Amino acid sequence: MLNKNIGYISPDYLYKYNSPINTEAILKIRQERQAKLFKFSHEKYYKAVQTIADIQSNFFDCSSAVIKVGHPEEISPGQKQRLYHCLQTFCPWKKGPFELFGVNIDAEWRSDWKWDRILPHISSIKNRKVADIGCHNGYFMFRMVDQQPELVIGFEPYSKHFWNFQLIQNIVKQKMLAFELLGVEHIHYYPQFFDTIFCLGILYHHTDPIGLLRKMRQALGPKGEVIIDCQGIPGDLPVALTPQKRYAQARGIWFLPTQSCLENWIGRAGFSDINCFFAAPLSVEEQRRTIWANIDSLPEFLDPHNPSLTVEGYPAPWRYYAIARK
């Protein structure tokens, strides 16, 4: 359905399912946060999306690395100029790649690499209810469409990311995709609702990773599956690094676990059948500066004389991917 201020919004799932979702709490937060979408500080984002409201296409391909929307010949030179300016408004693009009407967006992160690593290890999400926690601009949500889920709810509290998702959703109009301005701390409002939960790149940004994992477990139905991607450090001991202030120039990094530490977190949250299926140093090919993300990135975050260390002298980041069941 169309919302005159936002654009295309999928049918509200809250009224579809006979489940113990805390609808009252979700509606309250939704109302509060949707009002903030139009704050002066976010004006450039929603106005940018409005400038391309007339650009539409029936072509949407999410089956490969680059999410493709529209063909170049479907839009006029004037429309292409407006589209380009709209897309530039959302720089730096952190997740991708995308191609919109022939405009190639090479994002800072090769998110397709992550998806290609994960997909062979998960149970089918066909006809399943899925949560994507920290969905950002929706890259993984759009990739999931190809797997034919029943419903995908993206959890993302930041308004910029909402509008970034919306500029694409307004064109592709995928009914199974819902974007909520919620954080991982709200996942327990969906008790036993989801079949699969993706939590990619989130845990190390929070002060209570085990508590959040427990909330995710509450939100999973019987035999539900959680997929975790967590930044961490190398080592055999089940320990986590807590940086004094910054890690790889980033604030808001609280706990960086070793593989065994992450597995222990997941186990102590009550999950079983834990399988860490990927463990490797983060590479400067996977996270780097691009034209669409002209910002300092991993190459600048590492010690130029010793890339096994960050600029602060901590162990350089690893990525751990794990899957577990309720």
Curated annotation (Swiss-Prot):
One of its GO terms (molecular function) is transferase activity, transferring alkyl or aryl (other than methyl) groups. Carboxy-S-adenosyl-L-methionine binds at residues 95, 109, 114, 134, 184-185, 204, 319. InterPro entries: CmoB, Mo5U34_MeTrfas-like, SAM-dependent_MTases_sf. One of its GO terms (biological process) is tRNA wobble uridine modification. Pfam families: Methyltransf_9. CDD domains: AdoMet_MTases. Its EC number is 2.5.1.-. This is tRNA U34 carboxymethyltransferase. It comes from Trichodesmium erythraeum (strain IMS101). The lineage of its organism: Bacteria, Bacillati, Cyanobacteriota, Cyanophyceae, Oscillatoriophycideae.
